[in-house]
Amino acid sequence: MKFFKAKGSLLSSGIYLIALTPFVNAKCALPSSYSWSSTDALATPKSGWTALKDFTDVVSDGKHIVYASTTDEAGNYGSMTFGAFSEWSNMASASQTATPFNAVAPTLFYFKPKSIWVLAYQWGSSTFTYRTSQDPTNVNGWSSEQALFTGKISDSSTNAIDQTVIGDDTNMYLFFAGDNGKIYRSSMSINDFPGSFGSQYEVILSGARNDLFEAVQVYTVDGGEGDTKYLMIVEAIGSTGHRYFRSFTASSLGGEWTAQAASEDQPFAGKANSGATWTEDISHGDLVRNNPDQTMTVDPCNLQLLYQGHDPNSSGDYNLLPWKPGVLTLKQ
């Protein structure tokens, strides 16, 4: 910008002051109700896989790094990663590479205190397990498997499933589900992580089986205060069998959770408000985070949800459905 010298000119001085004033990033509160727009399906499973599902996504160096579960025609589970890509429109052309180990329902994040990447998942050598790496884009660069959690839950046909891990300044927390109307939590000192949460846990939410089913995710809300400092989403099964997400909020990761957008008619994300036309199910996924670290921070001004959906004309066993990725963007 060019400035003209004008003695005593308040206009030129004002412009100069404005030019030197840094812009302040606006902070948004979580909405009380949600309305989204949706992409179409963003990628198709490569040959040999029938579904891409259970997504975890981080943005590092301006690119999305996505890990996911896969299923085949027999309903067997595996896992994969996409080649890193910068825009959602590039996901269809990104490479799809099977992991050399099964990392089903994965959670990927950068553990900042020890400068290491962590990939947590289920159905390994313990109830939940993890591996570490210096480069999450190198599928062959992960460490040997270590125990993340060794506990067992009762009243569940699946045992503990669909973990997520998040940290605050002092502790790391493990949240998980069991397809049984309960959400569970375990914790440990952040100084002891990466490591095992052991076998102890507590039930933090309890209700009808279909209302608290699976796919729990927990996030720090950027700029959040009081009871909306943390956001939890949980996958539910609706009255007609379609999957949707309910949301809960809390003032601390170790505290109590309060229902926010928690009905099928007014969900966090579902058929009622997704804007999606290619799927009637909004299922297991991950909100796009501000940064890749253990705080799992999301920006309520720019919420996006990477989710799994499927053609409404497809039916049958859940594990045989042709799940594909899509992205919801919150309408402002």
UniProtKB/Swiss-Prot annotation:
Leader sequence segment: 1-26
UniProt keyword Glycoprotein, yes or no: yes
EC assignment: 3.2.1.55
SUPFAM superfamilies: Arabinanase/levansucrase/invertase (SSF75005)
A GO cellular component entry from the record: extracellular region
Alphabetized InterPro entries for the sequence: GH62_arabinosidase, Glyco_hydro_beta-prop_sf
Record flagged with keyword ATP-binding: no
Glycosylation: residue positions: N313
Listed GO MF terms: alpha-L-arabinofuranosidase activity
Keywords: Carbohydrate metabolism, Glycoprotein, Glycosidase, Hydrolase, Polysaccharide degradation, Secreted, Signal, Xylan degradation
Localization, UniProt: Secreted
GO BP annotation list: L-arabinose metabolic process; xylan catabolic process
Similarity section: Belongs to the glycosyl hydrolase 62 family.
UniProt xrefs under PANTHER family: ALPHA-L-ARABINOFURANOSIDASE AXHA-2-RELATED
Protein's UniProt name: Probable alpha-L-arabinofuranosidase axhA
Gene assigned in the entry: axhA
